[in-house]
Amino acid sequence: DKSRSRGLGDVYKRQIVGVPTGLTDLDEKLGGLHKSDLIILAGRPSMGKTALATNIAYNAAQHVLKRQEKSSIAFFSLEMSSEQLSTRILSEQARIRSDDIRRGKVTEEEINRYIETSRNIYNLPLFIDETPAITIATLSNRARRIKRLFGLSLIVVDYIQLMRSSLNKNEGRVQEISEITQGLKALAKELSVPVLALSQLSRAVEQRDDKQPQLADLRESGSIEQDADVVMFVYREAYYLERKQPKLGSIEHAEWQSKMN
């Protein structure tokens, strides 16, 4: 049919048919974030999940603004306040350390860059909801309202394990997470938008010599693996190497330094 032909034509032209992440390698791999997909972005703490998610949300909002579409990006931040998240986005886009922003340790050039970036972000169609421990029902209702009033291109959730379900606590956390991921997938289909949901990984990762994440590391979190259309992992080897610095001047230190570089 015509819609299928148009879709295939886009693929042949190597165009991004989904919501662009703004990250070239990722967009080439996925073709953007596709409607109705539940995309899981998982990793251990301090791996950069939120940093990656905020970059994707910012780039997607820029894309909407550039195309002058009646649409928006909804970011549900369960861990950070809207002020903290906004500061982080500002820091990343203005290329200024967030600690320096908080302490006022910025140069005049950085201040000018900060002001310009602030103006750009102010105009972005990016909604941040900072409700802690939000339920899947409440999140879904708010997403529906945003789509009805402003249009909606992408939902970001940071992160799954901080959400609550409507189940009795006696049902267990695994069942609760299962209801949440099933609800997020259902919402993606209902609103025909991609849902990018962040997830923590099992502590078992820390017990292995090879700490690169695997799908099995999601299994303690119920049906995440089964409900997701795409699973992506964030992994920084340098995070672990920094904690294993050998004695300065040793052969091991030279090898360690080579890996760090």
Language model features by range: what are they?
Residues 45:
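The conserved Walker
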